[in-house]
Amino acid sequence: MCIRDSSQTTSDLGSLLVGFSGSWLAGCIFWGWLRAHPVLHLPVEAFAVPVALGGLQGRWRLAATFYLSSLVGTACTDLAMAATGVMQFWPAVVTASLDQAPLLLHQAGTHLLQPLPLITLVISAVLVLLAGRRLSRNSGGFTGDVGSMAAAVLITTLWVDGLFLLSALLQPGLSGLIE
């Protein structure tokens, strides 16, 4: 019995690694070559959607769910950036000189503290939290721990985005966005 549990755990970890690798590869491609073009972010990140959709019914279910959950988180972030008006800062920040980029990133962060963008940001965060909670509770049509894992991936997006915003406000040079 322990051998099967250990084997299943190893299989699950391998599957999660495959899903993470798909997300990581897409991010590397975008941030490495196309980062100045925010309109390309989601299409590049979605390169493996056909493979992931096919994997939902087979042994790669965890990998596919991880990748798709990460993609949904990315879509939520991009939508919130567009809705708050901060997307307009993106090309300037990532193409600015090293001495100008932190100032531009800080300006983008402070833009989010204005009333309308802040309300939009809070509503967006609440919607993501509610979606994550729903996935976690009833597994959103998933079986076993897959729904909980999808919820964790989605909610982790909020943590990462929140830390990035905090960094942009307090110490823009440490955000990881500026080379």
Tell what function each PLM region has.
Residues 133-157:
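Interfacial loop-to-transmembrane junctions
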Residues 1-6:
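Conserved small/polar residues in nucleotide/adenosyl-binding loops
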Residues 9-22, 38-48, 64-72, 151:
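Cytoplasmic-side transmembrane-helix entry/capping segments in multi-pass membrane proteins
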Residues 62, 66-92:
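Transmembrane alpha-helix/helix-exit interface in multi-pass inner-membrane proteins
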Residues 103-126:
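Hydrophobic alpha-helical transmembrane segments
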Residues 30-40, 60:
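Membrane-interface helix caps and helix-loop-helix hairpins in membrane proteins
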Residues 162-179:
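Juxtamembrane boundary at the C-terminal end of a transmembrane helix
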Residues 89-107:
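Membrane-interface interhelical connector segments
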